């Protein structure tokens, strides 16, 4: 398809268990599954990976991204985040819609 991979940023979710899954996986489990999936599918030429929070809390998304970055496996792309709601939720809750200055 004549894609310029070196100019491409990929915005995936992390590999996490579904909402109905009763087992709680560790950040290390999530890191292993995520890095494995990326290595199997994403060309090394891709310019970078910017993770979405995928419905995780701000704390879980941050802990899991740290585990992914610390994971010793091959990661030929820069890894960062593109969180929206995960970083806004606690701020919006604290604000609560009040019109104070």
UniProtKB/Swiss-Prot annotation:
PANTHER family: FRUCTOSE-BISPHOSPHATE ALDOLASE. GO terms for molecular function: fructose-bisphosphate aldolase activity. It comes from Lymnaea stagnalis. Pfam families: Glycolytic. The keyword Glycoprotein does not apply. Gene3D superfamilies: Aldolase class I (3.20.20.70). Pathway: Carbohydrate degradation; glycolysis; D-glyceraldehyde 3-phosphate and glycerone phosphate from D-glucose: step 4/4. This is Fructose-bisphosphate aldolase. It is an enzyme of class 4 (lyase). Its EC number is 4.1.2.13. It catalyses: beta-D-fructose 1,6-bisphosphate = D-glyceraldehyde 3-phosphate + dihydroxyacetone phosphate. Keywords: Glycolysis, Lyase, Schiff base. The active site is at 11 (schiff-base intermediate with dihydroxyacetone-p). GO terms for biological process: glycolytic process. Belongs to the class I fructose-bisphosphate aldolase family.
């Amino acid at each position: 398809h004549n894609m310029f991979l070196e100019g491409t940023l990929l915005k995936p979710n992390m590999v996490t268990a579904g909402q109905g899954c009763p087992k709680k996986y560790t950040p290390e489990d999530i890191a292993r599954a995520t890095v494995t999936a990326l290595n199997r599918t994403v060309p090394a030429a891709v310019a970078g990976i910017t993770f979405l929070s995928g419905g995780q809390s701000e704390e879980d998304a941050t802990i899991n991204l740290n585990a992914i970055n610390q994971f010793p496996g091959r990661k030929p792309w820069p890894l960062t985040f593109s969180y929206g709601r995960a970083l806004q939720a606690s701020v919006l809750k604290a604000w609560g819609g009040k019109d104070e200055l």
